[in-house]
Design a protein with these regions (language model features):
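Short beta-strand/loop motif that positions the catalytic acidic residue
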Residues: 51-52, 57-59, 63
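Catalytic active-site module of serine/aspartate enzymes centered on a nucleophile-bearing elbow/loop
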Residues: 98-156
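Conserved adenylate-forming
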Residues: 11-14, 46-50
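Hydrolase active-site cap/lid region
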Residues: 1-37
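Flexible loop/turn segments at secondary-structure boundaries
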Residues: 3-10, 64-66, 91-95, 135
Length: 156
């Protein structure tokens, strides 16, 4: 899992400490140089339309590193069969979730891939968005959802 990040919010709106740590790991001390040489290119904008395989996006409803509006924009930019799961009341870490029976989202992603590769569960080109509630029945239950925002609109 990673950030969809079409708007580079991971460095512009998240905690400044996150950017400082990323700069340290990338070997940069100069923030202007880091923005120009690294951060400016860390986006999926302009690339999602080139994806050729079915795609699953999973995001926490209140993820500070990849806000819901960024995930919605990325979802709309995909032109392939697609699905997105929005995990109610969660942020970036998606493990040990009540929404998923105490399991990590990775377990469910593997099930999604198994269904895809076996031909048993194929997403549609139009796409499906599931709102995975804390007390719900998971991403394959009655969870179809239309986000109350469009790309570019703030969720909260």
């Amino acid at each position: 899992m990673a950030c969809f990040n079409p708007n580079n919010t991971i460095f512009t709106q998240s905690s400044p400490r996150f950017k400082q740590m990323f700069m340290y790991m990338a070997g940069y001390e100069d923030e202007v140089r880091f923005d120009r040489e690294v951060a400016s290119g860390m986006t999926v904008r302009g690339y999602l339309g080139k994806v050729k395989c079915p795609t699953l996006l999973v995001t926490g409803e209140f993820d500070p590193l990849c806000p819901l509006e960024d995930a919605v924009e990325a979802f709309h930019d995909l032109k392939v069969p697609k699905e997105m799961w929005v995990i109610e009341n969660q942020s970036h870490p998606l493990w040990g979730l009540a929404n998923l029976g105490g399991l990590d989202c990775h377990d469910y992603v593997m099930d999604w891939l198994k269904g895809l590769f076996s031909g048993q569960r194929l997403p549609t080109k139009r796409g499906r968005i599931a709102y995975v509630r804390e007390q719900g029945d998971g991403p394959w239950g009655k969870s179809d959802w239309t986000p109350p925002i469009r790309p570019g609109q703030a969720y909260f």
